[in-house]
Design a protein with these regions (language model features):
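Composition-driven low-complexity segments enriched in polar/acidic and proline residues
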Residues: 108-139, 151, 207-208
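Short, acidic/hydrophobic/Gly-rich beta-strand patch recurrent on exposed beta strands
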Residues: 20-25, 146-149, 219-221, 386
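Terminal RNA-binding accessory module
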Residues: 1-73, 150, 232-233, 399, ...
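Internal alpha/beta scaffold segment
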Residues: 154-203, 224-226, 231-270
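Small-residue-enriched alpha-helical segments and adjacent helix-cap loops
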Residues: 80, 94, 98-105, 354
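Local cysteine-cluster metal-coordination motifs and their immediate loop/turn environment
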Residues: 67-86
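Rossmann-like S-adenosyl-L-methionine
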Residues: 2-4, 8, 13-17, 217, ...
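Flexible, glycine-/basic-rich loop-and-beta segments that form/coincide
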Residues: 63-72, 154-155, 492-500
């Protein structure tokens, strides 16, 4: 197999993350965005040590597993790779991927309890947050608002019938795109921000909706590069006699009124205007102004209430998050109560560290079955939100510290009895992992959103005297290639292993 060669073959399986293994006469090639059983053409773009990687050119024959996509944007939108497969088949693929990765490192420890995969309680309309991009679907095409086209950094598909959000999102998306398209038709040149030339006004539309309360927060993200026909404020507009000029305030007021007039199932509690002049194509704020209502909303999980702002981290599938956190709580609570011989209502004398704690969701769920929970999170805004949420929920045994886990662990006087880990996708820094292991706690709970990072860290845990007792995959993201994994580790007795 040579670089540049076009091959055709059958996808034998899909490994995490989204790597289709294509078998052909010349050997095998790894290709993204392919499904098991598909016949595909791909171009080989890398050959190294006998292993080939390629780019998908065409699906020449559908997989016998495919049943058709309920989403009209499938194939053009880069979002939902698995949406043409039945949900049960998606779960089977994800379960096999996680089990294969775990087995690859746990074969040395012997048996462990793998509990399969837990399905999301809802498959359609499950997302509570979407970041839509402004752009065009082709060069100099009409204004688009939606998701990036598959394989493209620049082209944007208007996903007006997206299936992973509910109808309120779709109405808001259509409303905003039609509003700015109408302004363009009136000669007001509100262009999208061009990512190469770094010019333009419209950047992103952020929509968040609570699954339980139905509260909706909307944020329009723009640059400060106003179109020529638009002035910043009324005072600036008075300096010219051109009556066709608009102010930015007028444009934003018109958008606000258009949004508030929508017939929605949920309730808009806040509309924000965020300015962002950063070069990077990320949703961030240089300045945020409230156009309507407030800059936060409330969501409820497992009997707790959470105040969520524009940029607060929160699991994007609220009902799926309840399954994830119930699993984590059951793993830890079962250990605490059995080891103490305590009744379910009794609070044991245990200190829990929740590392990479985000907005403190897990910490607050663990608080009722622990003496104290200490959360550590590097994002200061998330820590502030965690502190406010503990007050909101009347929890007095939680402490949250803002800082890098690697550095903060050296400053905490308390010693943990149990450690909960929920790190970013790339896993735990090796030096932080060493400090965590040196506490020598009996049990560690590891929640991972990227199983390849998880198994890399598990190898270190196993080498340092821990074993995996229980593991389960949890599907938070139907139709996509992503999957969460929950693992409970316990410390082996000294005579069970030899450290070298």
């Amino acid at each position: 197999m040579k670089k540049g060669q076009v091959i055709e073959g059958i996808v034998q399986r899909v490994d995490f993350p989204n790597k289709g293994i294509v078998a052909c006469e010349e050997g095998t090639c790894v290709v993204k965005n392919a499904l098991p059983g598909q016949k595909v053409k791909c171009a080989v773009n890398k050959v190294r040590k006998g292993k080939a990687e390629g780019r998908l050119l065409e699906v020449t024959e559908a997989s016998p597993l495919e049943t058709g996509s309920p989403c009209p944007h499938f194939g053009s939108c880069g979002g939902c790779t698995y949406i043409s497969l039945p949900y049960e088949e998606q779960l089977r693929i994800k379960e096999e991927q996680v089990k294969k990765l775990l087995d690859s490192v746990l074969c040395s420890q012997g048996d462990y309890q793998f509990e399969g995969i837990k399905a999301s309680p809802v498959c359609f309309g499950y997302r509570n947050k979407m970041e839509f991009s402004f752009g065009d679907e082709w060069k100099d095409g009409p204004l688009s608002l939606g998701m990036h086209k598959r394989g493209s950094f620049y082209d944007v598909v208007s996903v007006t019938d997206c299936q992973i959000v509910d109808e309120d999102y779709r109405k808001i998306l259509r409303c905003v795109r039609e509003y700015f398209t109408a302004l363009q038709e009136r000669g007001i040149d509100v262009k999208f921000y061009h990512r190469l030339r770094h010019i333009g006004y419209l950047r992103h539309l952020l929509v968040r909706k609570a699954a339980k309360t139905g509260e909706i927060l909307i944020a329009l993200v723009t640059t400060t590069q106003l179109p020529e026909q638009v002035k910043k404020d009324a005072e600036e507009s008075l300096l010219t006699e051109d009556k066709d000029l608009f102010t930015e305030v007028q444009i934003l007021e018109g958008l606000k009124q258009a949004l508030l007039s929508l017939p929605l199932d949920g309730r808009i509690v806040g509309i924000l205007h965020t300015r962002n002049d950063a070069v990077a194509d990320v949703v961030k704020s240089d300045e945020t102004n409230i156009l309507y209502g407030q800059d936060y909303f409330y969501e409820e999980l497992l009997g707790l209430k959470f105040k969520i702002s524009q940029f607060s981290f929160f699991q994007t599938n609220s009902r799926g998050a309840e399954v994830l956190y119930q699993t984590a709580r059951e793993y830890i609570s079962g250990y605490i109560q059995s080891s103490d011989g305590a009744d379910a209502g009794k609070i044991p004398d245990k200190v829990v560290f929740d590392l990479y704690s985000g907005t403190g969701t897990i910490a607050q769920l663990m608080a009722p079955v622990a003496k104290k929970v200490i959360g550590v999170e590097i994002v200061e805004e998330a820590v502030e939100a965690a502190r406010k949420n503990t007050e909101l929920n009347g929890l007095h045994n939680c402490e949250f510290i803002a800082g890098d886990v690697l550095k903060v662990l050296d400053t905490i006087e308390e010693k943990p009895d149990i450690i909960i880990l929920d790190p970013p996708r790339d896993g735990i820094h090796p030096k932080a992992l060493d400090k965590i292991i040196r506490y020598g706690v009996d049990h560690i709970l590891y929640i991972s959103c990227k199983p390849t990072s998880l198994v890399r860290d598990l190898e270190v845990f196993l080498d340092r005297g821990y074993r995996v007792d229980r593991a389960v995959a949890v599907d938070q993201f139907p139709w996509t290639a992503n999957v969460e994994t929950v693992v409970l580790l316990s410390q082996r007795k000294a005579d069970d292993y030899v450290e070298v």
